[in-house]
Amino acid sequence: MRTQDHPNNSPGVPMKFPVWFENFQIKYINPIAVPLARITPGITVITHRGRKSGKTYETAISAYRKGDTVAIMLAHGKTNWVKNILAAGEADIRLGRRDLHLVNPRIIAAGTDDASLPRMARMAAKRGVGVFVADIA
């Protein structure tokens, strides 16, 4: 399957990685990433519920905060965790030693220059990466 045909590739949120890397990460990297995220600087865990199953999931991500806004770059496209949080309207995240509740999730389309985003997320958005944004409750 080509990257352009992958379900994660959607308008405004292009998938930047090749499909083989996506599959490799899901199968081998993700199972060890969540336990390591608890002790690795720069990586955090976002907790969300499945939109169909209702099951609780944890996903390792890199998040950036500016004020009461959290931003996460979507180089993998519109993945299942993003779809789950958009459907639920909320999620929990641990940033540093603080557990935070996220509300009002939304996606900033690739190519957007939004000054309210953290610097790293703003640079990624300008370079063609979609950004997941949510407010801290």
Please identify what each model-predicted range represents.
Residues 12-13, 48-53, 83-87:
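Short, functional N-terminal and low-complexity linear motifs
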Residues 25-26, 56-57, 113:
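Short, flexible segments with low predicted structural confidence
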Residues 28, 32, 36, 61, ...:
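Solvent-exposed, flexible loop/coil residues
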Residues 1, 17, 96-99:
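A subset of signal/propeptide-processing and intrinsically disordered low-complexity segments
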Residues 41-74:
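Short beta-strand segments
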Residues 6, 76-137:
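Short, structured beta-strand-loop surface elements
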Residues 3-44, 83, 119-129:
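Alpha-helical membrane-targeting segments
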